[in-house]
Amino acid sequence: MKKWAIKAAILLGIIFLTNAVNAEGYMYGKNEVDLSYEKDCYLQQESPDWELMKKRPKVKGIYMTGYTVSMTERFNKLIDLVKTTELNAVVIDVKDDNGLMTYSSNLPDVGFTGANKNVRIKDIDAVMKILRDNNIYAIARIVTFKDRIAGDKYANLAVKNTSGGIWRDRHGMSWLNPYNRDSWDYLVDIAEEAAAKGFNEIQFDYVRFPTDGNVKIIDYGTSAAGKSKAEAIAEFLSYGRERLSKMGVVVSADVFGLVTSATDDMRIGQHLESIARSVDVICPMVYPSHYGKGSYGVAEPDFEPYKIVNRSMSIAKGRIDAMEDVSRKAVLRPWLQDFTASYLERYKRYGPAEVRAQIDATYDAGSEEWLLWNAGNVFTSGALLKE
């Protein structure tokens, strides 16, 4: 259904009255009102008004966890970094890799899952005011289908195994079923709430099918009949963009770096041209350390950051530019490596030269935007131009 946020008391009543509980979690209780979506296929839609895209800046950003935002000194240092360099944007976790909210959501369905149990950001409105006052473009990162909190609580939204139980990856994580439109609503409702808080852009991460674990025993159910994984992911993103564009926000999607050159969906539902029709911005994670030896003819990719990023982004831009059947196509904005991949057998220590090489490679490939990734939120200021 189109909207499914139900007051907690009503939801609990439905659950207990219908005994809709199984051993692995609550079944999401539906009412019988408005069970139809506006469209059968969300790939069949007009592109939203791109005035949003014309007004926004050429994004140059960094990533922040909820924990970093909650630590006043760390947060202020990063805000100062943005203010004193070419940076103009921040990506902030809203729903993290475990499915937990970083600030307290007012959505009853989210509260019922327990996703608010460990919020880091106590006053998101104050954070948003700081960003607005400093003219910093705010991007909400929402980890999408990887969600052990909602997947465990609402069993009927989760990916199942062939025995009918909740499927789990090799880390014990449950995932929301990308074919299930009710899981779409859980996610887009969170995105709409973030947009209402003042985020300029919603960035969907882990917007894919699971890969780790015994995927051979996955059963996606009847909703998967006759539909490819790539279609399911593209439809979800189109549906999200349709709802979010009405709120005046941009929609972006993170994709694996290899998506830029793979001609299929890599069995995860990420196909470049399909996603380019469904979002405003595509963010390939082109970290050199993540490429196998010999990729693009480079013996050790981690040692050649310029070559890997430039080649990846050049291929992606060429493919998107060649899409003659679409008048409006997604902008490319890569995630770049601002960390040292010390887990590799042989690795290069990344400093100002290596980070700047990736930025230059992005520009030389014809893209004008980029984001820096460091999981600990410690960024290489020496790689950035001063303002």
Features from the language model and the residues they span:
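Glycine-rich, aromatic-flanked loop segments that form ligand/cofactor-binding clefts
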Residues: N88-V94, R120-I166, E201-F204
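Active-site-proximal loop/short-helix segments
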Residues: N106, R148-N156, K197-S228
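An active-site-proximal structural segment forming one wall of the substrate-binding cleft
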Residues: M71-R74, D80-T85, I130, G172-V207, ...
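Catalytic domains of carbohydrate-active enzymes, especially glycoside hydrolases
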Residues: N76-L100, A196-E201, V281, T362-E369
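Aromatic-lined carbohydrate-binding/catalytic grooves of carbohydrate-active enzymes
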Residues: T85-I121, T211-I218, L384
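Aromatic-lined carbohydrate-recognition surfaces of secreted/lumenal glycan-active proteins
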Residues: I139-D147, Q203, K229-I268, V326-F339
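Active-site-adjacent "subsite" loops/lids of carbohydrate-active enzymes
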Residues: W50-V69, F145-A196, R356
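Substrate-binding cleft of secreted/luminal carbohydrate-active enzymes
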Residues: V279-H290, P305-N310, I315, R319-E387
